[in-house]
């Protein structure tokens, strides 16, 4: 469920040494499954352990995860990184905003998951996003661009060389193409 690097484990052991005996860490997600999802790590004293918590054992401590956060922490990783500016814990939880879907889930759910977890975070750097409108009977994903992508002069390249290529590679035999139905209006909101 959660991978904690050796460096991060050593850091937690050091921090927990100054806490009351039996204290572990808690990894959690606030507002899981939403665009506002935020992940965190806190101390978890023995009296804060809930009966439905999931306990993950590590070297010298345990990480407690509440039942509601667990599916959103699949494939999460915690690392302790040191560089010229100092040291910091990093927590990456790719499924915090949207629960990972099973490989046998309906095509529309799997495509929506890829859009929300992989494509939209890339487009967000330009203030843009896409939305899946429908999948046609011919297997074409009909998309609508929003934000900075609406009216952007690079939208055709983004669609064909980026999004379509990625989706066709991920869903061969199920998806035959992508189509943009956005009424593009170039304006100050447009990225380029």
Curated annotation (Swiss-Prot):
Gene3D superfamilies: Fe-S cluster assembly (FSCA), HesB-like domain. It holds the Pfam family NifU. Keywords: 4Fe-4S, Iron, Iron-sulfur, Metal-binding. InterPro entries: Fe/S_biogenesis_protein_NfuA, FeS_biogenesis, FSCA_dom_sf, HesB-like_dom_sf, NIF_FeS_clus_asmbl_NifU_C. Its cofactor is [4Fe-4S] cluster. GO terms for biological process: iron-sulfur cluster assembly; protein maturation. Binds 1 [4Fe-4S] cluster per subunit. The cluster is presumably bound at the interface of two monomers. [4Fe-4S] cluster binds at residues 149, 152. One of its GO terms (molecular function) is 4 iron, 4 sulfur cluster binding. Belongs to the NfuA family. Homodimer. NCBIfam families: PRK11190.1 (NF008392), YhgI_GntY (TIGR03341). This is Fe/S biogenesis protein NfuA.
């Amino acid at each position: 469920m959660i991978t904690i690097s050796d460096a991060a484990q050593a850091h937690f052991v050091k921090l927990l040494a100054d806490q009351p005996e039996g204290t572990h860490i808690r990894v959690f997600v606030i507002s899981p499954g939403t665009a506002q999802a935020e992940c965190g790590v806190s101390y978890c004293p023995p009296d804060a352990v809930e009966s439905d918590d999931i306990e993950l054992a590590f070297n010298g401590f345990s990480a407690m995860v509440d039942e509601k956060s667990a599916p959103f922490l699949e494939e999460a990783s915690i690392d302790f990184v040191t560089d010229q500016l100092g040291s910091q814990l990093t927590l990456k939880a790719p499924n915090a905003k949207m629960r990972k879907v099973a490989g046998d889930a309906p095509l529309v759910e799997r495509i929506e998951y890829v859009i929300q977890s992989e494509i939209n975070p890339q487009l967000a750097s330009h203030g843009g996003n896409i939305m899946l409108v429908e999948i046609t009977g011919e297997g074409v994903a009909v998309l609508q661009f929003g934000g900075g992508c609406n009216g952007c002069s690079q939208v055709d390249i983004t669609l064909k060389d980026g999004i379509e290529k990625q989706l066709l590679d991920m869903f061969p035999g199920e998806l035959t193409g992508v189509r943009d139905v956005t009424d593009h209006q170039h304006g100050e909101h447009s990225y380029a």
